[in-house]
Amino acid sequence: MQKTVLEPQRGFSFENCERNAALQRALPGLRVPHARKTGTTIAGLVFQDGVILGADTRATNDSVVADKICEKIHFIAPKIYCCGAGVAADAEMTTRMAASNMELHALSTGRECRVATVTRMLRQTLFRYQGYVGASLIVGGVDFTGPQLYSVHPHGSYSRLPFTALGSGQDAAIAVLEDRFQPNMTLEAAQELLVEAITAGILGDLGSGGNVDACVITAAGAKMLRALSSPTKPIERSSQYRFAPGTTPVLSQTVVPLTLELVEETVQAMDVE
């Protein structure tokens, strides 16, 4: 029985990264691939009955708005959700993998998965790839220990906080949260604060925009609130831009007759059998 010379290794392969570095040293002026700037505003906070997560809905490709209604709040478990910022594909696939693993974990143990379990798996996965998976995540949920909120960074570091914000608009969002957050807030007050924080990120960052999505997680379950607020509504036209024929004068007119020559005519019979 023949075997391969090298056994397949698990984890991320850094061969292309080392190749790019060697080419850059050997060929001065060579343009090597660089990380693309991403834009998002995501936030979350803990209130008296659970956790509420929020995000904007704009997906960008450099300076181009690729999607205006992108969904950035991902399902992990019935009472655990995750907001993703950074590279959209990385965040989507990372959260899908986490959701699949948590479902297998729940089936094998017969218990609901904990928020700390999800966070541990996500940070171990991101740490293994040393930041090359560009996903900044906010994990929020409710388990038997109560409501919990975690922020997980692309290199694998994490923090458990009562409120947090990530993304390119995090500075404006965290400023609002730090100013108005209070422990044991009601759902109405927490929802209003979250909308104001995401709105501040949208108005203060070109990479964020669209609507404000939210997800309320309590011990009874989770509820998605799509398009909870629209801080950047389209500007309505003050009047109709329709002009009567003849408003713009025609100064000159030239008519060029177009002659057509039939080169070949083919008739294809239809098969009726």
Curated annotation (Swiss-Prot):
| EC code | 3.4.25.1
Q: What induces it?
A: Up-regulated by interferon gamma (at protein level).
- Pfam families attached to this UniProt entry: Pr_beta_C, Proteasome
Subcellular location per the Swiss-Prot or TrEMBL entry: Cytoplasm; Nucleus
Main location per UniProt?
A: cytoplasm
Identify the propeptide residues: 1-39
Q: Which reaction does it catalyse?
A: Cleavage of peptide bonds with very broad specificity
Supply the SUPFAM superfamilies for this chain.
N-terminal nucleophile aminohydrolases (Ntn hydrolases)
| Maturation and modification | Autocleaved. The resulting N-terminal Thr residue of the mature subunit is responsible for the nucleophile proteolytic activity.
What the entry lists under PROSITE patterns is as follows: PROTEASOME_BETA_1 (PS00854), PROTEASOME_BETA_2 (PS51476)
Cite the position(s) of the site with description Cleavage: G39, T40
Which residues are responsible for catalysis?
Answer: T40
Q: Which residues carry this modification: N-acetylmethionine?
A: M1
What class does this enzyme belong to in the EC scheme? Answer: hydrolase
The record's GO molecular-function terms, alphabetically, read:
endopeptidase activity; threonine-type endopeptidase activity
Return the InterPro entries for the record.
Ntn_hydrolases_N, Pept_T1A_subB, Proteasome_bsu_C, Proteasome_bsu_CS, Proteasome_sua/b, Proteasome_suB-type
Per the record, the domain of life is: Eukaryota
Q: How does it assemble?
A: The 26S proteasome consists of a 20S proteasome core and two 19S regulatory subunits. The 20S proteasome core is composed of 28 subunits that are arranged in four stacked rings, resulting in a barrel-shaped structure. The two end rings are each formed by seven alpha subunits, and the two central rings are each formed by seven beta subunits. The catalytic chamber with the active sites is on the inside of the barrel. Component of the immunoproteasome, where it displaces the equivalent housekeeping subunit PSMB7.
Task performed by this protein: The proteasome is a multicatalytic proteinase complex which is characterized by its ability to cleave peptides with Arg, Phe, Tyr, Leu, and Glu adjacent to the leaving group at neutral or slightly basic pH. The proteasome has an ATP-dependent proteolytic activity. This subunit is involved in antigen processing to generate class I binding peptides.
The text of the family note is: Belongs to the peptidase T1B family.
Name the PANTHER family on file: METALLOPROTEASE TLDD, PROTEASOME SUBUNIT BETA TYPE-7
Q: What is this protein called?
A: Proteasome subunit beta type-10
Organism of derivation: Bos taurus
Which lineage ranks, top first, belong to the organism behind this chain?
Answer: Eukaryota, Metazoa, Chordata, Craniata, Vertebrata
